[in-house]
Curated annotation (Swiss-Prot):
<feature type="active site" description="Proton donor">
    <location>
        <position position="80"/>
    </location>
</feature>
<feature type="binding site">
    <location>
        <begin position="218"/>
        <end position="219"/>
    </location>
    <ligand>
        <name>substrate</name>
    </ligand>
</feature>
<dbReference type="Pfam" id="PF01678">
    <property type="entry name" value="DAP_epimerase"/>
</dbReference>
<comment type="pathway">
    <text>Amino-acid biosynthesis; L-lysine biosynthesis via DAP pathway; DL-2,6-diaminopimelate from LL-2,6-diaminopimelate: step 1/1.</text>
</comment>
<feature type="binding site">
    <location>
        <position position="200"/>
    </location>
    <ligand>
        <name>substrate</name>
    </ligand>
</feature>
<dbReference type="GO" id="GO:0008837">
    <property type="term" value="F:diaminopimelate epimerase activity"/>
</dbReference>
<feature type="binding site">
    <location>
        <position position="51"/>
    </location>
    <ligand>
        <name>substrate</name>
    </ligand>
</feature>
<keyword id="KW-0963">Cytoplasm</keyword>
<keyword id="KW-0457">Lysine biosynthesis</keyword>
<feature type="binding site">
    <location>
        <begin position="228"/>
        <end position="229"/>
    </location>
    <ligand>
        <name>substrate</name>
    </ligand>
</feature>
<feature type="binding site">
    <location>
        <position position="13"/>
    </location>
    <ligand>
        <name>substrate</name>
    </ligand>
</feature>
<comment type="function">
    <text>Catalyzes the stereoinversion of LL-2,6-diaminopimelate (L,L-DAP) to meso-diaminopimelate (meso-DAP), a precursor of L-lysine and an essential component of the bacterial peptidoglycan.</text>
</comment>
<keyword id="KW-0028">Amino-acid biosynthesis</keyword>
<feature type="binding site">
    <location>
        <position position="166"/>
    </location>
    <ligand>
        <name>substrate</name>
    </ligand>
</feature>
<comment type="subunit">
    <text>Homodimer.</text>
</comment>
<feature type="binding site">
    <location>
        <begin position="81"/>
        <end position="82"/>
    </location>
    <ligand>
        <name>substrate</name>
    </ligand>
</feature>
<keyword id="KW-0413">Isomerase</keyword>
Amino acid sequence: MSRTFLKMNGLGNDFVVIQTLTEAFDPTPEQIRAIAKRPGVDGKGGIGCDQVIAIDPPRAEGASAYVRFWNSDGEVAGACGNGTRCVAWLLMQSAGKDAVAFDTVAGRLSGVAAGDKLVTVDMGPPGLDWTQIPLAEEMNTERVELQVGPIDAPLVHTPVCVSMGNPHVVFFVDAPVTDDFARGTGSLVEHHPLFPEGVNVGFAHIASRDHIRLKVWERGAGLTQACGTGACAAQVAAVRRGLTDRKARVEFDTGSLTIEWRESDGHVIMTGPITMEYAGKLPELVAA
């Protein structure tokens, strides 16, 4: 029997969402890659997405679901900010509620309705210790000894590292970078030996104390139109460096997220839109 999926996106960062309340979903990495592969000019390929998301029955009291994420390369992802908003919206729609909580491998997340297809999610506190990223060696994560390019004229250097349930490194740049720059530099840094689990790479331009321009090279997915945890990491990194206030607009080419690193409890709060694209059926070979 084929399985129904929902295609959703947050600022163009797109997902195949599979609800498993009545039928388990235990895909192989090959099946995830088959689903995520974007169709070519010949029409061959999968559905196409940055991440695959499974919404499972809850495993703990107080949660509406247990949620799993995979990157398009087939590897399990610890967290996904834009995907979290999409999941929160779906669960709220299903329950007829304005607030919801669900569990992930990275911990419990919660979301509240903030308007028409606008969702605010509590992403929890960031991980700032080198062991939480993780890094291969002890290091001050506010000023990491890393650079790309010639020693006397590096392209980017001295980034900040943050965990948002997944590892991020944020480079501050004097001007917004091009897609080609983000691809070339991001792909190099993603697999740097300093990051034993790989890393998401952000390039953040501080436009003002409440405005960041951002591009993100996602671990296992490549250059994406938007990255929710990347936006959270960029804002946390900027606050740590004294570059922005606690609340800022993080802008991608496709739109903006509002990110607040709340001083009262240290949690990162993200507000942004979701888009429901369509529903479909998985091909039999990848229905898992």
